[in-house]
Design a protein with these regions (language model features):
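Short, surface-exposed structural microsegments at secondary-structure boundaries
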Residues: 1-95, 102, 198, 202
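Structured loop/turn residues at beta-strand edges in well-structured enzyme cores
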Residues: 86, 106, 133
Length: 202
């Protein structure tokens, strides 16, 4: 008959591996609020999130000491921060400005943001996005629908492999790649004109 050994009796390297296997990809909501600080006479940013603390960090001290998560998105002396594993977690920022994420810019691997493809995005916001050159995956929640993002798909220097860029229609939930959006656009306006034949050809 098999005998269950108390977890604490397993060798440390086995216990560490078990804690590592508890890692699951989470979508971590990241937003900021401003607060007036009377002591300094300044307005300070504080991170806010609806994402709960990772369950493993609430289990025991040994789990917390494994370094599976790190404190992130802390602004200056603010006591507020989030626990994140940047290798697996997806950072969801909604309409939050990319500038606020500058301290974590080189750590973030996966991001979701919500925008309209307007002039502000095309000529300003996209420049901030392009600085996040360690990204491996981007999801864009399209407030104005998928078709409106065809121009951005062509113009933006996406800082991750283009096959890892996904667009999501906010209203319908439909998902599409940039190439899918190209096809949708062609179905409406027709294919791009072919190159004209050189002079003298028949």
């Amino acid at each position: 008959m098999a005998v269950f050994r108390p977890f604490i009796r397993f060798p440390l390297e086995i216990r560490a591996r078990v804690w590592e296997l508890t890692l699951e990809q989470r979508t971590v909501d990241v937003g900021y609020v401003t607060q007036w600080e009377h002591s300094s006479g300044r307005v300070r940013l504080h991170v806010v999130s609806s994402t709960p603390l990772p369950a493993v960090l609430q289990s025991c001290r040994e789990a917390r000491n494994q370094g599976l998560y790190q404190q992130a998105f802390r602004e200056g002396r603010s006591p507020r921060y989030l626990w994140v594993n940047f290798k697996v977690d997806v950072i969801s920022i909604g309409h939050t400005d990319f500038d606020y994420l500058e301290p974590e810019r080189l750590l973030i691997r996966r991001i979701i943001f919500e925008r309209e493809n307007d002039e502000t995005f095309l000529y300003l916001t996209r420049l901030d996005l392009e600085k996040f050159d360690r990204l491996e995956e981007i999801q864009v929640v399209c407030v104005d629908g998928l078709l409106m993002w065809q121009e951005a798909w062509e113009m933006v220097d996406w800082p991750c492999p283009k096959e890892m860029v996904k667009f999501i229609d906010k209203e319908t939930g439909q998902e599409a790649s940039g190439w899918d959006i190209d096809k949708m656009w062609e179905n409406i306006v027709g294919p791009p004109p072919e190159d004209s034949e050189p002079e003298g050809s028949e």
